[in-house]
Regions:
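Bacterial Sec-dependent N-terminal signal peptides
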Residues: 1-28, 246-249
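Extended soluble regions of mature proteins
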Residues: 23-249
Length: 249
């Protein structure tokens, strides 16, 4: 009888602990996330056989950039963040997606992106990217938040690994990545050797004025932009293909 009583007490204590933990979890509806984007330039060079060891030595292995994502309820704004200490040269003469500003209205499934491609600025107005995610059981902590892994395939051939947290209610993410039951804190494109990873999450008030829709650039949709970029890069070979993939993310 005593054993049963002790076991019942332990169950009650465990349940109370779990309930207390759930009550202490803060679910964010607005705030700011900093992402670090890392491109493994050496790996990209190995994919492009024309590069020499001498050329490889002129640049650092990883090209690092920082971006901020502001979010408030069903809206997000992804934009360039603080300057990186990385001053090394780039695999690309013109670093693609370096100045991207991406606004997403998640409730209405609309996106407006301002993208600089070479010397021209485009304003891409379209619906949100449709991504068929497959959620897995793998978990990890990112920026202090518990995250779960999901996999997907985009643009017919790009394999995506993402980790999202349901502790942030907004279902957004960096660049055009969204559609999971929470905020995406890490995205990896293994075959493109690129990773976006949240370095910090701040619970701050985000006024509507800070989520301003970008307005600068030639108005296009994703299909028109793809045709334009393909035409411009038709003689670039494999490097052109890699550039185009970054532009269209």
């Amino acid at each position: 009888m005593k054993k049963k009583f002790h076991f019942a007490v332990l169950l009650l204590l465990f349940a109370a602990g779990r309930r207390s933990q759930a009550q202490n979890t803060i679910f964010l509806s607005q705030g700011k996330i900093e992402y670090e984007r890392r491109i493994n330039q050496y790996a990209r060079m190995e994919d492009e056989n024309s590069w020499t060891e001498l050329e490889k030595k002129t640049m650092s292995q990883f090209k690092t950039s920082y971006f901020d994502l502001l979010f408030s309820h069903g809206k997000t704004l992804y934009r360039p963040g603080r300057e990186s200490a990385d001053k090394g040269s780039s695999f690309f003469i013109d670093q693609p997606a370096q100045d991207n500003i991406v606004y997403a209205d998640l409730d209405n499934e609309k996106s407006v992106s301002q993208k600089k491609i070479f010397e021209e600025v485009f304003l891409v107005q379209d619906s949100l990217r449709k991504i068929k995610w497959k959620i897995t059981d793998e978990t990890r902590a990112i920026a202090g938040l518990s995250c779960r892994r999901a996999n997907a395939l985009i643009m017919d051939s790009i394999y995506v690994v993402a980790f999202y947290t349901d502790e942030i209610l907004t279902s957004g993410g960096p660049e055009s990545f969204s559609g999971l039951p929470g905020m995406i804190l890490e995205v990896s494109l293994p075959h493109q050797h690129i990773t976006w990873s949240a370095t910090k999450v701040e619970a701050v008030n985000v006024p509507d004025a800070q989520l301003a829709v970008p307005v600068k650039g030639k108005k296009v949709n994703n299909s028109t932009l793809l045709e334009t970029v393909q035409h411009s890069l038709k003689d670039w070979g494999k490097q052109g293909q890699q550039y185009m993939q970054l532009v269209m993310l």
